[in-house]
Amino acid sequence: MDIKRIILYVIVALLAIALFNAWQRDYPPTPKPTPTVEQPTANGDHPTAYTPPAFTPGAAEKTKKAGTIALTSKVPEARLITVRTDVLDVEIDTQGGNIVSAKLPKYPVSLEEKQTPVQILSGEPNELYVAQSGLTNGNGQPTTVQFESAKKQYVLENGQNQLIVQLTGRAPDGLLVTKTYTFHRDDYAIHLAYQVKNNTSKPWQGSLYTQITRRQPPTEHHHFYVRSYNGASMGSPQTPYEKLSYESLDKQNIDRTSQSGWIAMQQHYFLSAWVPGNPELTYHYYSHVIPASGEPNVYVVGFVSPQMNVAAGSEAATHATLYVGPEIAKRLKGLAPGLERTIDYGWLWPISMLLFWILSAVHAVVKNWGWSIIITTILIKIVFYWFSAKSFRSMARMREMQPRIQALKERHGDDRQALSRATMELYRKEKINPLGGCLPMLIQVPVFIAFYYVIIESVQLRQAPFIFWIHDLSVKDPYYILPIIMGLSMLAQQWLSPTSPDPTQQKMMWILPVIFTVFFINFPAGLVLYWITNNVVQTLQQWYVNKTYESHKAKLKARRARKRKR
C-alpha cells in the first residue's frame, strides 16, 4: 500500500472529523423540551401564551425592540380559527390575529409516525414558536385588536386554488382594521394584507410590524450525529444571508435598516420567515431577548414597515408574506433574494447547489434518490477521471522508484541530508513530482464536502427510500450493512494496489478500512451510499489505469523521443 494513499485517507478522515466538531459546536441538537408548571394569575385566569410587543420611540422609525410576553399557558380554544390546505394546517388566534400553530401534513415526523405531521409553529408555552403581526401607532406602541371572522374553520376544498381568511376588528383608537390571510394550493407562503380605515376625525399614523417569537430549545451534545443550524437568520441586499445564533442575539440585539430583505428562524429542513411586501421600501429590522427564569430565553426577531399616514375618513393598505415550510430552493428563491441560502450548504454553497441541480435532474428521470446519488457519483468520477488517472500513474511511477530509493538509503545510511538531496535529485532526473499522487486526489475533496452537505441538508432526501432495508437515506443504516460494504470496497482498493514490503504499511492496509467502517456507522445512509459508489468506481478506474499503464508509458516514451528528434 502506498504511503500517499494513507496520507490521503487520513486527510479525508480529519476533514470529516472537523466537519462533525464544527457542527457540534455551532449547531447543537434540539432535544424534547422539559415540562413547566403553569402559574395562575391573581384572578385565577391563565395569561395568554404571548401578547403583541411593546414598541417604544426609537431613532428614525420610532420603533424599537419588542417588550414582554406572557409565557405560562396556551391560547384558549374559543379564540382559535383553524385553516386547512393541502400542505398546511394552521391555527389563528383572534386576539391579534396571529398564527400560533402551523403543521405540515405532507411531512410526517418519522416513518414510524406517519400520521403525525411536523409542527413548525406552536403556542405551547414549553415550545413557544409563533408568527405575530400587527399595527403600531405614531409613537411606536402596538395596537391591540380583537378580531372576528365569519367562520371558525376554513378548508381549501377540491377544485379550489385559493383560500381567503378575513379578520375584522376595531382598534382602541377607533380604526377599523381588516386583516386578511391568503393561502394557495401547494404553497407554503401565506400572504398577509392589512387594510386600515380611519373613521375618526383625526389623522392616524402607524406602521406594520411582523415578528417571529420563539423559545430557545434546550441544548445537549451528541457525538457523530449531524445537526443542522438552528437559530435566526436574515438577509438584505448588502448581505444576502447572515446567521444570527441565539448566543449572538444574547450579546447584541438587531437594530438596523435595510431596503427589502427578510428575517427567519431556521431548523433542520424547515424554517419560518417574514418577507416585506414592497421590495422598494426601507424596513427597520430588530430583535429582543426575553429572559425566562429557570427556562430557556424567548427570542423575538422581526421588522417594521415605513410609517403610514392616513387622513381622517381615508384608508390605507400594507402587506407582507409569511413562509412556513420546508427549505426548498425554488420556493424560497421566488420569495426573496438570498432566502434560499437558508438551506445550509456551508462554505461550498455554489458547488453544493450545482451538485443538487444535477442530483435533481437525475431524480427526474429515475424517480429514486438512492439511484440518483449513485448515478451522480458516477458522473462526478467521470468528470474527475483525468485527475484520478494522473494520480494513479504518479503512484505507479513512485512504486517503480522504490528499489532505487532503497538503494540510496543503503548508500547514505544515517546521513539524512545526503539521502534527501539524492532522493530529490532522482525525482528531478526522472521528472517525478513527489506530491503528484496526492494533489489530483485532493482537488476532489471540496466536491466530497459539498456533496456531503447536499445529502445532509436537502429536505428532498428526508425519509426518501432506496431499496430493500433502506427506507430513509437521511438517517443511518439500521442494520449497518452499507458501512460494512463500504469497508469491503476499501479493502478491494487495497488489494488492487501492490503490497508494500513495509510491515507498518501492511498493517495500515487492514486497519484503515476497519477505522472508516466504524467511523461511517452513524453517517446517513445516503452519504455512505455515495462513498461506496465512489470507492467502487475509483477501484474500476484504478484497475483500468494499472492495466494500461505499460502501454501508456510506452506511448509517452515514444512521444518524448519524437520531440527530441525535432
UniProtKB/Swiss-Prot annotation:
The keyword Transmembrane helix applies. Its main location: membrane. The chain crosses the membrane at residues 3-23, 346-366, 369-389, 436-456, 509-529. One of its GO terms (molecular function) is membrane insertase activity. Keywords: Cell inner membrane, Cell membrane, Chaperone, Membrane, Protein transport, Transmembrane, Transmembrane helix, Transport. It is a multi-pass membrane protein. It is found in: Cell inner membrane. Pfam families: 60KD_IMP, YidC_periplas. One of its GO terms (cellular component) is plasma membrane. GO terms for biological process: protein insertion into membrane; protein transport. The keyword Acyltransferase does not apply. InterPro entries: Membr_insert_YidC (IPR019998), Membr_insert_YidC_N (IPR028053), YidC/ALB3/OXA1/COX18 (IPR001708), YidC/Oxa/ALB_C (IPR028055), YidC_ALB_C (IPR047196), YidC_periplasmic_sf (IPR038221). Interacts with the Sec translocase complex via SecD. Specifically interacts with transmembrane segments of nascent integral membrane proteins during membrane integration. Belongs to the OXA1/ALB3/YidC family. Type 1 subfamily. Required for the insertion and/or proper folding and/or complex formation of integral membrane proteins into the membrane. Involved in integration of membrane proteins that insert both dependently and independently of the Sec translocase complex, as well as at least some lipoproteins. Aids folding of multispanning membrane proteins. This is Membrane protein insertase YidC.
